[in-house]
Amino acid sequence: MQPSLLRSWVTLPEDTGFPLENLPWGVFSTPDRDARIGVALGDHIIDVRMLSERGFLGGCGVSAVDLAAPRLNRMLEGGKGAARALRIELQRLFSAACPDLQDRPDAQHFLVLQAESTMHLPVDIGDYTDFYSSEDHARNVGMMFRDPELSLIHI
């Protein structure tokens, strides 16, 4: 793992997989916060809905309604550009060089410890088909890796 080039005002573990360069989207809840969009940062989760409700993400091209949703679907409908703009703004807000959040007395309210959170399925999946459940597909895949006579493994 390469060291992070961006510095955050949030204390991050040295070996974190979630520095400012890698902010993955997800959905989380806590006992006092219902399911909402969040982004991992170190061993924390950034509460995106709370940031949006406080007016920090207004210029990113994603509506506050979409960011308040309990799933990522509405946000993702905005395309890569919207997600990229949000990620760039989160990098700016949580950068050590940006005073916008870090100088606020309530700055820690925008963060939740991952260990105290429950993660949820991040999107509503509308129409998934498992093609491998078809015997024909299983046979065709089996022939790619085994002798055609042994394409299906019978247990």
Where are these regions (language model features)?
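Short, Gly/Pro- and small/polar-rich lid/capping loops
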Residues: 1-27
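Conserved small/polar residues in nucleotide/adenosyl-binding loops
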Residues: 153-155
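Short beta-strand-centered aromatic/proline hotspots
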Residues: 38
